[in-house]
């Protein structure tokens, strides 16, 4: 991904750095409208995810995470921007006339060919089961056979195949977690593109609001009814031994994963902080 630096003509563009990738014409049969976001509220209208709301209207692109066009070669026709994710997507024209979007693998260019199947070459962008050589870089990894890729889908994400034993493969995920997955599940070879997404600088607050992200307010400047850290005269301490969430739970060190999940035995090493 190429980063475009703005010329410092105004204060808002002084520190701006954005992706210079050109948008392409989206195929109408691969997009559909989606309802406006819930602004971080649940069905009862209670905020469950803070600092969300507003933003520009979006059309959802149908992404092929299953890669179930078996043994049919496809050609990359265009690389496009997707407002619903930080990774880019590419339009694939298959030999049987099918057209689909997939996540853009890093290094793939327009004109490259890809294919998915059980006996396909281990090449960037190809999708095949986890019966691959050790050390292979992977993304868009299935957890349940046939459900489609669920792991390592963000921009720049890459997992590594580190061991194989019996019917299971051991993967090291981008978070640092090491877990077992059935070697019949499929994955895509390579790394997700748009690696330099963290180098972008929006340059102004309005660009952040276009993305549907609202300002983040510190709990210490709120009222006691809104946050455990709130209240006091002037600049007051939080009044607690340890920081807390808006709901009163410990903010630091508390594990958020549910206990006794079915996949507990599949995780060999939990993610690194």
Curated annotation (Swiss-Prot):
GO terms for molecular function: rRNA binding; structural constituent of ribosome; transferase activity. Part of the 50S ribosomal subunit. This is Large ribosomal subunit protein uL2cz/uL2cy. Residues 1-23, 223-273 are annotated as: Disordered. InterPro entries: NA-bd_OB-fold, Rib_uL2_dom2, Ribosomal_uL2, Ribosomal_uL2_bac/org-type, Ribosomal_uL2_C, Ribosomal_uL2_CS, Ribosomal_uL2_dom3, Ribosomal_uL2_RNA-bd_dom. GO terms for cellular component: chloroplast; mitochondrial large ribosomal subunit. HAMAP family: Ribosomal_uL2_B. SMART domains: Ribosomal_L2, Ribosomal_L2_C. The lineage of its organism: Eukaryota, Viridiplantae, Streptophyta, Embryophyta, Tracheophyta. Pfam families: Ribosomal_L2 (PF00181), Ribosomal_L2_C (PF03947). GO terms for biological process: mitochondrial translation. Keywords: Chloroplast, Plastid, Ribonucleoprotein, Ribosomal protein. NCBIfam families: rplB_bact (TIGR01171). Belongs to the universal ribosomal protein uL2 family. It is found in: Plastid, Chloroplast.
């Amino acid at each position: 991904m190429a980063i475009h630096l703005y010329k410092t003509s105004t204060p808002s563009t002084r520190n701006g750095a954005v992706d210079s990738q050109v948008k392409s014409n989206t195929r109408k049969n691969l997009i559909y409208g989606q309802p406006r976001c819930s602004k971080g509220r649940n069905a009862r209208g209670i905020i469950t995810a803070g600092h969300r709301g507003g933003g520009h209207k979006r059309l959802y692109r149908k992404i092929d995470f299953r890669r179930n066009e078996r043994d049919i070669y496809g050609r990359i026709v265009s690389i496009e921007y997707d407002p619903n994710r930080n990774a880019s997507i590419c339009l694939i024209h298959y030999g049987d006339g099918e057209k689909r979007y997939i996540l853009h693998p890093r290094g793939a260019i327009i004109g490259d060919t890809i294919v998915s199947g059980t006996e396909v070459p281990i090449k960037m962008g190809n999708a095949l089961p986890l019966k691959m050589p050790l050390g292979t870089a992977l993304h868009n990894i299935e957890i349940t056979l046939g459900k489609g890729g669920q792991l390592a889908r963000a921009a720049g994400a890459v997992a590594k195949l580190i061991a194989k034993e019996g019917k299971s493969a051991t993967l090291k995920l981008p978070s640092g977690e090491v877990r077992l997955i059935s070697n019949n599940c499929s994955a895509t070879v390579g790394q997700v593109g748009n690696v330099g997404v963290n180098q972008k600088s929006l340059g102004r607050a309005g660009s952040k609001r276009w993305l549907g992200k609202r300002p983040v307010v510190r709990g210490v400047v709120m009222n006691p009814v809104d946050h455990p850290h709130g209240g006091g005269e002037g600049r007051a301490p939080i009044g607690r031994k340890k920081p807390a969430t808006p709901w009163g739970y410990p903010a630091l060190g508390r594990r958020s994963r549910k206990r006794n999940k079915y996949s507990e035995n599949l995780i060999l090493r939990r993610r690194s902080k």
